[in-house]
């Protein structure tokens, strides 16, 4: 194991490293981050998310499915519309912390 990987294991525990790495891989996609940012302001319909993110509804649904599988967003259906919201406050904190870290010089 490389030195940075050993240091990470000390913070989150060796058993959690693969899951955390998978989460960061999911968050590494700009389209998914843009969708999470839009959803962080409140529950949103797929069509609205697609329009604001500049994606097709099909591409948006695909990315949202990945985020839902990772338990980052939750879904609510109302008739023919599908709405997404952040799964919990941990997701909002994760996004806020990542943005703060990325903005550090």
Question: What annotation goes with each model-predicted range?
Answer:
Residues 1-27:
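N-terminal leader segment of winged-helix/HTH proteins
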Residues 16-20, 24, 85-105:
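Conserved segment of winged-helix/HTH DNA-binding domains
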Residues 30, 41-45:
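Short capping segments at the starts of secondary-structure elements
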Residues 38, 52:
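Residues within the alpha-helical elements of helix-turn-helix
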Residues 45, 56-59, 87:
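Helix-turn-helix DNA-binding motif, specifically the short coil turn and the N-cap/start of the second
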Residues 51, 62, 68-69:
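Alpha-helical residues within the helix-turn-helix
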Residues 68-78, 85:
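Beta-hairpin "wing" of winged helix-turn-helix
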